[in-house]
Every structure is written in C-alpha cells, then in structure tokens.
Amino acid sequence: MKKEIASHLLEIGAVFLQPNDPFTWSSGMKSPIYCDNRLTLSYPKVRQTIAAGLEELIKEHFPTVEVIAGTATAGIAHAAWVSDRMDLPMCYVRSKAKGHGKGNQIEGKAEKGQKVVVVEDLISTGGSAITCVEALREAGCEVLGIVSIFTYELEAGKEKLEAANVASYSLSDYSALTEVAAEKGIIGQAETKKLQEWRKNPADEAWITA
C-alpha cells in the first residue's frame, strides 16, 4: 500500500522532488520535497484508494472509533469520505477558534467521552495534527490516534507526536516515495543521497551539497 500510494502521489503531481533546486518552506527551511495532497481531490480513483486505505488503517489500529475528525482544511474532505465509508459521525477542527459567531474551534459534534480518530493529509512536524488532538481533548473526547495520507518521517514530527502521547499511522511515507521515485527513474543515485541526507537533519543545509 505504501508504494502504491507513493506512486499515485508522484503521478498526479501531489508530490514534487527537486533535490537540485530546493523549495523554500514558509519556515524558511530549504527542502527537496513539496507535498500538496489537495490535488488528490481532483482524481476520483486516487481519492477512493486513499479513503479505502485510511479506513483500513483505522479498522486495524483504532477499531473502537466513534467519530472521525478532519483537520482544517486539507483533512476535511478525506475525513468526510472515510466517515461515509464507515458510517460514522464526522467533525472538523480549526487551527484556532473562530473570531465570530459561537467562536467554535470544532465544527460538528464531538461529545465528551467519544472516541475520535483524526484524519490529516500530511505529517511533517506534526504541529497541525497535535493542535487538532489538543482541541478534541479539551472538549472531553478520547483521541485514539491520527491517520494520514503521507509522512515525511521527520524526527521532529515523531518526537512531537510522542510527547503529545498520540499514535499516528500513515498510508505512505518518505522512504517509500524515494524508493518509488528511484524505480521510476525520476531521481538518480546522487539525488537519492541528497533526499536521504535531508531527512536525517532538515535544518542542516549540508544535504544540498551532499
């Protein structure tokens, strides 16, 4: 499944690899990869495969789930499709409470004591997913864990998720993606090395000249 999803993401352009011409993230960090999983919304077969895969992850790891929660905004559509497949209630969680109306951070019902699984599109440092988890916990929900489409497998993300005491599972990951990209001839040996070095320490730009 990991390599299948990675292949889909590469084929539709949801993931770009440019180790020789790095992207600059909003944080200012240089990166050889850019991921925009919103593009999966435009490809019915891809999004259906993703929904089925996320459902499998949830059933395997969080079988007692009662509510599916999407992260705003990228996780909302996938959460909706998964909740529909599983015939479960769904809500979504904003990055912060609204500044008007009722000031809701959680939209839809997520009641005290309910067992919730968070659906996220991408795990990088884990920040947005953890914000979602914390809001649900503050509302009295029991957060079973997180499922996502893709993870960069960054140590910073793993450490934050562990510190937040939340389990996280992804359909595909950075390792599978680089392997598939190499198999497809998208990247060569030199590019593969740069990608591997970046993941070890993204903040150290020495990978650019690796």
Curated annotation (Swiss-Prot):
Gene3D superfamilies: 3.40.50.2020
Cofactor dependence: Mg(2+)
Enzyme Commission number(s) of this protein: 2.4.2.10
Keyword Glycosyltransferase among record annotations: yes
Catalytic activity: orotidine 5'-phosphate + diphosphate = orotate + 5-phospho-alpha-D-ribose 1-diphosphate
Binding-site list for 5-phospho-alpha-D-ribose 1-diphosphate: R94, K98, H100, E120, D121, L122, I123, S124, T125, G126, G127, S128
Biological or metabolic pathway of the protein: Pyrimidine metabolism; UMP biosynthesis via de novo pathway; UMP from orotate: step 1/2
GO BP term (any one): pyrimidine nucleobase biosynthetic process
InterPro entries in the record: OPRT, Or_phspho_trans_dom, PRibTrfase_dom, PRTase-like
UniProt binding sites for orotate: S124
Keywords, alphabetical: Glycosyltransferase, Magnesium, Pyrimidine biosynthesis, Transferase
Recorded GO MF terms: magnesium ion binding; orotate phosphoribosyltransferase activity
Enzyme class of the recorded protein, top EC level: transferase
Primary role: Catalyzes the transfer of a ribosyl phosphate group from 5-phosphoribose 1-diphosphate to orotate, leading to the formation of orotidine monophosphate (OMP).
Quaternary organization: Homodimer.
Family according to the record: Belongs to the purine/pyrimidine phosphoribosyltransferase family. PyrE subfamily.
Protein name (database record): Orotate phosphoribosyltransferase
Species: Bacillus anthracis
Classification lineage: Bacteria, Bacillati, Bacillota, Bacilli, Bacillales
Gene name of the encoded protein: pyrE
